[in-house]
Amino acid sequence: MEAKTFAFLEIAMFIALGIQTFVAVTDAAGKDDEHFSVDYCGMNCTQQEDGSWTACSGRNGECRCYHESGKRSGLCLSTTYIDFSEYGNLSDSDIAAASPRLSMKESH
């Protein structure tokens, strides 16, 4: 009897986990107004003997050292997050109004 109860609860847990995963994936897939990117800065970082990490000097200070726990080497990465919903909804007329115009100079 205990084995059947345990098996039933285990199956119910896997079904609930599957539903939760499906909901999370479909919710994240609909986030077209957010953008997250990670770029490699072309260098690595290492942990020094005093515990500090070597600096990542690329891209005007945008690069940071990311490493796994317990590892003495890492990667210099630049991360960017943009939430496009902060900018509102631009219409075609807004974009046209913000576009640069050619100056008309008369020559004599």
From Swiss-Prot:
<comment type="function">
    <text>Salivary chemokine-binding protein which binds to host chemokines CXCL1, CXCL2, CXCL3, CXCL5 and CXCL8.</text>
</comment>
<feature type="disulfide bond">
    <location>
        <begin position="41"/>
        <end position="63"/>
    </location>
</feature>
<feature type="glycosylation site" description="N-linked (GlcNAc...) asparagine">
    <location>
        <position position="44"/>
    </location>
</feature>
<keyword id="KW-0325">Glycoprotein</keyword>
<feature type="glycosylation site" description="N-linked (GlcNAc...) asparagine">
    <location>
        <position position="89"/>
    </location>
</feature>
<keyword id="KW-0964">Secreted</keyword>
<protein>
    <recommendedName>
        <fullName>Evasin P1127</fullName>
    </recommendedName>
</protein>
<keyword id="KW-1015">Disulfide bond</keyword>
<feature type="disulfide bond">
    <location>
        <begin position="56"/>
        <end position="76"/>
    </location>
</feature>
<dbReference type="GO" id="GO:0005576">
    <property type="term" value="C:extracellular region"/>
</dbReference>
<feature type="signal peptide">
    <location>
        <begin position="1"/>
        <end position="28"/>
    </location>
</feature>
<dbReference type="GO" id="GO:0019958">
    <property type="term" value="F:C-X-C chemokine binding"/>
</dbReference>
<feature type="disulfide bond">
    <location>
        <begin position="45"/>
        <end position="65"/>
    </location>
</feature>
<keyword id="KW-0732">Signal</keyword>
